[in-house]
């Protein structure tokens, strides 16, 4: 996708194969890490994503999904939010701003609206509560550092609640380092 710092996209051919997924699952079962943090681009596109989540949860791990929210609107993923909630997966979702204009400039037209609908789907299942964590990620547009995380979190919480009825747990501020 044009905004991605690792040039990830649904049309890319580089995906984790079954052998690698099996090795990861075997390692998780053997070592039982406290956290399994699954990231991508959009890691849910991997045919092994649900198996990785299920096996990690079976091993007693806390699972986090670095989710771009728009995946919840894509054909074939209509049940993804149910799967995530059923497995109590912490969702860490990219939302580079709480306004449509800024998100459109960074990620393209329609992304903000899809992201809001995705957040509303997650909220409807209880995400944003203590049991189903929903954390958002802010990253500034262009080569600059983000502002104060606590101030931005308060701004996000007020704007998203007022405009869309959306709640979430925390906001994380990051700065992307282009590596692709």
Tell where the protein language model's regions lie, with residue ranges.
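Short cysteine/histidine-rich metal-coordination sites, predominantly Zn2+-binding motifs
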Residues: 16-24
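Local cysteine-cluster metal-coordination motifs and their immediate loop/turn environment
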Residues: 1-6
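Alpha-helical scaffolding segments of alpha/beta enzyme cores, especially the outer helices
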Residues: 23-26, 48-58, 79-82, 114-117, ...
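Core AdoMet radical
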Residues: 8-17, 31-46, 57-76, 84-120, ...
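Radical SAM enzyme [4Fe-4S]-AdoMet core and its adjacent flexible, acidic
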Residues: 92, 99-180
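Surface-exposed beta-strand edges and their flanking turn/coil or helix-capping segments
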Residues: 18-19, 51, 78, 106, ...
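Short hydrophobic/aromatic-rich motifs at helix boundaries and adjacent loops
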Residues: 24-25, 53, 89-92, 129
């Amino acid at each position: 996708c044009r905004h991605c710092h690792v040039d990830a996209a649904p049309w890319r051919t580089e995906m984790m194969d079954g052998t690698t997924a099996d090795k990861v699952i075997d390692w998780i079962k053997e070592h039982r890490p406290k956290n399994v943090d699954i990231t991508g681009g959009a890691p849910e596109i991997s045919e092994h994503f649900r198996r990785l989540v299920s096996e990690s949860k079976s091993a007693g791990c806390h699972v986090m999904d670095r989710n771009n929210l728009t995946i919840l609107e894509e054909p074939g993923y209509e049940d993804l939010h149910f799967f995530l909630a059923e497995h109590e997966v912490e969702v860490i979702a990219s939302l580079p701003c709480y306004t449509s204009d800024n998100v459109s400039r960074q990620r393209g037209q329609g992304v903000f609206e899809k992201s809001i609908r995705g957040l509303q789907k997650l909220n409807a299942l209880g995400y944003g509560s203590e049991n189903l964590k929903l954390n958002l990620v802010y990253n500034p547009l262009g080569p600059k550092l983000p502002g104060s995380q606590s101030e931005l979190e308060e701004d996000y919480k007020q704007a998203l609640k007022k405009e869309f009825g959306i709640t979430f747990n925390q906001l994380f501020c990051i700065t992307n380092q282009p590596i692709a």
